[in-house]
Amino acid sequence: MGNGERPPARRPDSSGSPPPAADAPAASNHPFSSHDTKHMTSRRLASRTAVAASLSALMLAACGGDDSANAPTAGGAAPLTPAVASPAGPTGSTPGSTPGATTAPAPSSTSAGQLSVDKMAFAQTHVVPSGGLSWTLPNASASLRPISRRDALVLVAIGQADAVQPVLEAWKDGAKLGALALSPPSALPPTESGGRAYANDRWSAVVPAAWMVPGVSFSVSASNYTSSVAQAPVFGTDADVQLTILPFYLFGADDTNSPPLSTTQAPDAATQQEIFAKWPTAELKVRTHPAGRFSLATVVVGPRADRTGAAQPAYPVTALDQQKDGYGVMSAMLTLITNMRTANGDGPLNDQYYAPLIALNSNGQFANLGGGLGGVGSGAAVGDHRYTGIFIHEQGHAFGLNHAGDEYAKGAYPYAGGSLSGSVWGYDPNHREFLDVLVPTTASSYAKCASSHQLDAQGRCYKQDPMQGGAGDQSSGYKFATFSDYNTGRMQAWIASRVLADPASSTGYSKWDSAAQARAPYTPTTDNNGLYGVNQNLPVQAGVPVHTIVVSFSKAGSAGASYIYPPFSYTGNLIATFDPTSAADRQAITVDKGTYPWYCKGTGCDYTLRVTYADGSQTYRVLQGGFRAWWTPTVDDANATNPLSGSSFRVWAINVPGDKRIGKIELLDTPMVWNGMPANPTVLLSR
């Protein structure tokens, strides 16, 4: 990309954070969690193979959703394509249909004496045909494929009613991997809450994760028929997802007056299993951030409207009830955790961050947060500590999902009003049962759902997606309601798009190649001439001592809004940053001429962090981005000094070497620092 090309679109806000999606407070009567969790928990959930000694089937998995508010009315907009109402009783085929979804046809060339397979599907998070599902909508497209390297319940409809002792065979590269006896339709797993049967003609078996890989094909034989035509599933990514939990204890909250770290630092084991059942990943790894927690006495809220809609300047908060709207502190914390994730080199990776916010009011009492925020596609979200509907909804935003009802209205979601009317069924391996698209009788929403949900021809309620009022649509015993197949496919796409730290790769990184159905070595590159960082902000040093420093700054001079947060130290990563006292580093970021000619071109490089260690040594780091007009790094933005504008407020986060204790942190005024470092720069802030 040449230096003279048209500038790329500016990112949504001045701090570099994705736009958050605000969610109405979710009703909750949960007390403080009392589950005991080891300090600094790090749990690893791999897909589990549960093949019985007889090699007949057990069940596998998708665990449903639970979420936020704003369910549509039953009289909402019509589906993009007509939905077919699900039949009431047992059926020989999957109940329901999938508007807008396309399934790959099964092989059909069968010779005499050969077993025919009418349908083959794999139940993981959802019941997905071997060729996958795909959608083409007016303003979006998506696909959902069987998940590679994850156990699956295979479901087979056999064409011959007299087949005796059918067996599923797995083959790869001409070699037989093994065979599984198929359980008869009478042994099919039940449906949640004792609901209608998924089907009455499906034979089944649990396929181990080792067989659920590209290149494997499956055929079915019987003692009285030869093997069927083989089907090779089209697989989605085999990537894992890491969930990093970083609790924020705010305004004096601690283990004596609030839910303790032992219960906030990670979901309990059962909840982790349910999250894994929900997300389309081969493995879920849950860890508490190596810092443990981040305790803050003060939080700075950026310019935003108050409860009445009136614009307010940035301001400091020392108790939750001081915020001027219900999402002020959450918004500030989402910006912090998003920027900290980037500073640690986790931005492009398959790592989702979640920050439980534990806060006190001005009376010193624990305050119920009542909601959450997630940066759409950012990989980061904040919310309460209970790991229920708020959590799964906000992490949905982090995966790139918006509110499903809004997306339906825009032609970017296939099912009316953000519902599951038309989705394939889900499946949960932990309960070993199918998840209907209809609200189950044991759901808390069941009794009154007709006034707020889409209805089928018999007046029964369809579930809402967790991204549109699904909280309460799950069966008793579940924490989360059921995502639609479409939104699960979009989560799978987010996972597939991530860079994977991969020791098996020659470069140390890999990415999923959907066409090849395989990981390919990935070499980090600097996009957009360094506009958003170097080498995609991947680590240049990993697993080293670091100090994370967060600075908020109001160029408008709003009272108390310019603030250096207390640093915290842990074992983390360092990304490429620049020392303005080095001529070589200044040359590298010189606008339009340096190695990274756009590094400072977006909104300037006018501020420097100076860190003085306890031994007197110092380190300097340029803070990328400031208050310049977009693509004019020598001219201030028109609203740079307008206290009511987000253009007057900035939050930076940066990691610096942490092998020595910090003595002082200073923010320096260094205008257009690529031209030279001032001999005696003005100190704007000091801690």
UniProtKB/Swiss-Prot annotation:
Residues 233-501 form the Peptidase M66 domain. Binds 1 zinc ion per subunit. The active site is at E394. Pfam families: Peptidase_M66 (PF10462). Residues 1-45, 73-112 are annotated as: Disordered. GO terms for biological process: proteolysis. Keywords: Hydrolase, Metal-binding, Metalloprotease, Protease, Zinc. GO terms for molecular function: metal ion binding; metalloendopeptidase activity. The keyword Nucleotide-binding does not apply. PANTHER family: DICTOMALLEIN-1-RELATED (PTHR39540:SF1), PTHR39540. Belongs to the dictomallein family. This is Dictomallein.
